[in-house]
Amino acid sequence: MNWITNYVRPKINSMLGRREMPENLWIKDPESGEMVFHKDLEENQWVVPASGYHIKISAKDRLKHFFDNGAYETLENPKAGVDPLKFRDERRYIDRLRDAKAKTNLDDAVVNAIGRIEGLEILATVQDFAFMGGSLGMAAGEAIVRGFETAVERRLPLVLFAASGGARMQEGILSLMQLPRTTVAVDRLKEAGLPYIVVLTNPTTGGVTASYAMLGDVHIAEPGALIGFAGPRVIEQTIREKLPEGFQRAEYLKEHGMVDMVVSRLEMKATIARLLKILLKEQATEENGSRRLPAPEAAVVEAAVNA
């Protein structure tokens, strides 16, 4: 063996050899099949530039694009019981939780954050579908209630981005208890005269649609979002009939009066800021820290009359 064998040949092989490319460098558009560079998607809020298809977005990416200059303060989620039923199916529930936390770097499926949009201070509650399908368990329920309580304490409007497959089956009845708890939290926000806007993203299904996700003053849906209690396949198998084209999709629900508007993720921030200014009856500024808040119902009626 000599220096050519030991040093030169490996160098040449490393320079000319086939290089492995990261698997997630290019992402396929589910609608058109087009391959899109992941950096372009990140910059475009995970909306495919050509087709407008909305790819699922993480809670952290959504907050970064939603708040002014990407600046916000996250609230610490309250502690909740872990695996109270010692549940196990194909895997232990506690193992699924551990994997979800490692995958998303989140404590659970809900993130609360306070920041400004067009100078207006708000509280945003975001569900991350990557964490066990955004399912609603005790920890997620506690986080949602904490978000509403903080909004009332600090006199802030609340914007909730729903993304969930429904109640977390591994927690049984303890998961279902979060439906009335979150509903009561919404009522307290409304009693305080604070606006509540819900953004329904893909998908928003199950018990989430039977509670806080459908109790907003204004309901906005992202294009193509699946929204409903039971999924379309379950309904078809139950009624033994073919459902209409686009059934339970955002555009279909808009046509049938279930949501107020369908808005692209790229226009979401501006749309919500405009709605909140109407509900709060004032123009938001960077310096304005205090405001007199009318009841949402009165503000909505006035806005409709004057439109």
Curated annotation (Swiss-Prot):
UniProt GO MF annotations: acetyl-CoA carboxylase activity; ATP binding; carboxyl- or carbamoyltransferase activity
The enzyme's E.C. designation: 2.1.3.15
Pfam family, one: Carboxyl_trans
GO biological process terms, semicolon-separated: fatty acid biosynthetic process; malonyl-CoA biosynthetic process
Pathway stated in the Swiss-Prot or TrEMBL entry: Lipid metabolism; malonyl-CoA biosynthesis; malonyl-CoA from acetyl-CoA: step 1/1
Keywords: ATP-binding, Cytoplasm, Fatty acid biosynthesis, Fatty acid metabolism, Lipid biosynthesis, Lipid metabolism, Nucleotide-binding, Transferase
Residues in CoA carboxyltransferase N-terminal domain copies: 25-294
Role: Component of the acetyl coenzyme A carboxylase (ACC) complex. Biotin carboxylase (BC) catalyzes the carboxylation of biotin on its carrier protein (BCCP) and then the CO(2) group is transferred by the transcarboxylase to acetyl-CoA to form malonyl-CoA.
Name this protein carries in UniProt: Acetyl-coenzyme A carboxylase carboxyl transferase subunit beta
Lineage: Bacteria, Pseudomonadati, Pseudomonadota, Alphaproteobacteria, Hyphomicrobiales
Gene name per UniProt: accD
